[in-house]
Amino acid sequence: MSKIIQQLEAEQMNREVPDFTPGDTVVVQVKVKEGNRERLQAFEGVVIAKRNRGLNSAFTVRKISHGEGVERVFQTYSPAVAEIQVKRRGSVRRAKLYYLRDLTGKAARIKEDIKRG
């Protein structure tokens, strides 16, 4: 990759992102534009995947809403993402937790990681 592209990406990656891994429960504050006003919408769920590619980094958050599984992919350095807050650290042994899609109820719970607390 050329030096110019690396420099431009470094300038755009100025946001401080908290350290989180798959299995962690996060609250993502997303900027939503409704008409002429803008508000923040919270999306809370478990991180099931993380993609580290510099400026193109992304992570997938899964939550259960009214008995239906909802997944949303967020670009880590997107201007639409206002804030990422880690609520709970999870202890898992996989990098991609896609198997949670097939689990329901108590089986889909993730053990809390007390060491990283």
Swiss-Prot record:
GO terms for molecular function: structural constituent of ribosome. Pfam families: Ribosomal_L19. SUPFAM superfamilies: Translation proteins SH3-like domain. The keyword Heme does not apply. It comes from the Bacteria. GO terms for biological process: translation. One of its GO terms (cellular component) is cytosolic large ribosomal subunit. InterPro entries: Ribosomal_bL19, Ribosomal_bL19_CS, Ribosomal_bL19_sf, Translation_prot_SH3-like_sf. The keyword Ribosomal protein applies. Signal peptide: none annotated. Keywords: Ribonucleoprotein, Ribosomal protein. Belongs to the bacterial ribosomal protein bL19 family. PANTHER family: LARGE RIBOSOMAL SUBUNIT PROTEIN BL19M (PTHR15680:SF9), RIBOSOMAL PROTEIN L19 (PTHR15680). This protein is located at the 30S-50S ribosomal subunit interface and may play a role in the structure and function of the aminoacyl-tRNA binding site. NCBIfam families: rplS_bact. This is Large ribosomal subunit protein bL19. It comes from Thioalkalivibrio sulfidiphilus (strain HL-EbGR7). The lineage of its organism: Bacteria, Pseudomonadati, Pseudomonadota, Gammaproteobacteria, Chromatiales. The gene is rplS.
